[in-house]
Amino acid sequence: MANTDDIYEDRLVFAAYDERVKELFKVFAEGLAQGEPERPSQERFRRALRFAQRARNLAMQAVQQEKTAEAEALAAAPAS
């Protein structure tokens, strides 16, 4: 069964990603409202979105590696 802390960490990463996407969209929409050209604004948004996705994926990998390391340490610990 999954540890509550593990689920909490996963949710934090996804919540942070959600917030970042919201911020990116607001910047994108505001730029369009200010008269920025659509094509460059869209490219900038897409590039920022890719970086946010990459950061989310790397963070999830790190969380997963930490979970694995903790599980291995518990398994290797002598039974009391």
Task: Please tell me what each predicted stretch does.
Residues 2-80:
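Soluble, non-transmembrane alpha-helical interaction regions
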